[in-house]
């Protein structure tokens, strides 16, 4: 099956997170028939597929682990799509469908490249593996995170991770990610006293008391960033207060915010800074809950990155820009432990949008690029 047909077959499966919807069994069959050792790892409602070929050691060569995901975000209002989101449609030189860019096109390209690689080089140096989950777009608890202990216990911990996430900006290969900022979620609850607006006092209203604090949080500066990372930033994502009635003052205000932090501001220091700020503004009785969903990692450097850059130059005729922008990926489960993580994939301009799409020419080129990345790292011609 070529990469276009395989992408279409994957997109046609309604795999809204965490439902794999049969994507992984199809890929597992292809990889098994090509000589890969395949294992399935299900945790809760999440499916994870691991396929591996060869052996890695300091004598034989490194272990390359490709990472992907078969789950997609919901399509949104399906009547706003120009064609049904789970009926992959070619139009104007592009393939349209939910998940075609994030990241079923890359899933297909990784599988095609891996099968082609081991067919051409059955006795290749090192080990090449693929780990795919159906829990990347969701909580990411029963996905890659849950498989990590198995990798460590069975000697399958990688030397380098290649992630097929859509990293390109305007053209295929113009950008790859060599690290990521962390992601921290917080929920702040400020107590007040619910009452009739005609009788409530300003000091009873948590929305009034929170005003200066909201402004201070929005203006908070943590660091200046550096040549590899943007500054750490906080964004308030939700504010909830009141009953919906215009004559009832709220008894509680709930504020949700997200922080993207670089390595210069670790989570513990960031938490202390924010908690000190809340104390200083004294908004009344409050409680704050934290959840760290990703630690920052990178930027990576060295021979593996050099090999990937050389592969891009050879196949696409240009050296990619190296950056650490964007959101989080499943590289978060390897990068903070010292594994170089390199993310390379198609253009990300339409991911999570209505009429998500990718250029057919880019899809056809991806397996060649991915093959060249492996060949360059393993020293195979």
Please annotate each region the language model reported.
Residues 103-179:
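Acidic/histidine-rich catalytic neighborhood of metal-dependent amide-processing enzymes
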Residues 1-76, 252-256, 270-271, 360-362:
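N-terminal helical capping/dimerization or prosegment-like subdomains
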Residues 67-69, 131-133, 161-165, 189-191, ...:
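Short beta-strand segments
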Residues 61-129, 154:
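Active-site metal-coordination/substrate-binding segment of hydrolases
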Residues 39, 65, 129-131, 287:
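A structural signal for isolated positions on well-ordered beta-strands in alpha/beta enzyme cores
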Residues 166-171, 178-179, 184-381:
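Metal-dependent amide/peptide-bond hydrolase catalytic core
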């Amino acid at each position: 099956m070529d990469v276009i047909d395989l992408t279409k077959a994957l997109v046609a499966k309604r795999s809204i997170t965490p439902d794999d919807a049969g994507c992984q069994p199809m890929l597992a069959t292809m990889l098994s028939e090509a000589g890969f050792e395949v294992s399935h790892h299900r945790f809760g409602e999440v499916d994870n597929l691991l396929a591996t070929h060869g052996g890695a050691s300091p004598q034989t060569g490194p272990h390359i682990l490709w990472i992907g995901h078969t789950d997609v975000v919901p399509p949104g209002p399906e009547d706003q799509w120009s064609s049904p989101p789970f009926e992959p449609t070619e139009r104007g030189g592009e393939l349209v469908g939910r998940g075609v860019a994030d990241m079923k096109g890359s899933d297909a390209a990784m599988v095609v490249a891996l099968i082609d690689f081991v067919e051409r080089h059955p006795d290749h140096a090192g080990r090449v593996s693929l780990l795919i989950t159906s829990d990347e777009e969701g909580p990411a608890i029963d996905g890659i995170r849950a498989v990590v202990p198995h990798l460590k216990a069975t000697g399958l911990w990688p030397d380098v991770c290649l992630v097929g996430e859509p990293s390109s900006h305007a053209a295929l290969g113009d950008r790859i990610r060599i690290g990521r900022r962390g992601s921290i979620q917080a929920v702040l609850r400020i107590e007040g006293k619910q009452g009739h607006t005609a009788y409530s006092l300003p000091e009873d209203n948590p929305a009034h008391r929170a005003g200066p604090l909201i402004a201070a949080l929005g203006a908070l500066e943590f660091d200046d960033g550096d040549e590899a990372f943007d500054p750490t930033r906080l964004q308030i994502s939700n504010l909830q207060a009141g009953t919906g009635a215009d004559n009832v003052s709220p008894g509680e205000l709930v504020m949700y915010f997200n922080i993207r932090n670089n390595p210069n501001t670790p989570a513990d220091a960031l938490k202390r800074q924010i908690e000190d700020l809340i104390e200083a503004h004294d908004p009344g009785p409050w409680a704050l809950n934290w959840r760290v969903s990703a630690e920052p990692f990178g930027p990576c450097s060295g021979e593996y990155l050099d090999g990937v850059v050389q592969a891009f130059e050879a196949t696409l005729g240009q050296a990619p820009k190296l950056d650490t922008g964007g959101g989080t990926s499943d590289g978060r489960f390897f990068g903070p432990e010292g594994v170089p993580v390199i993310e390379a994939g198609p253009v990300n301009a339409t991911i999570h949008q209505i009429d998500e799409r990718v250029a057919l020419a880019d899809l056809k080129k991806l397996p060649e690029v991915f093959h060249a990345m492996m060949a360059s790292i393993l020293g195979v011609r």
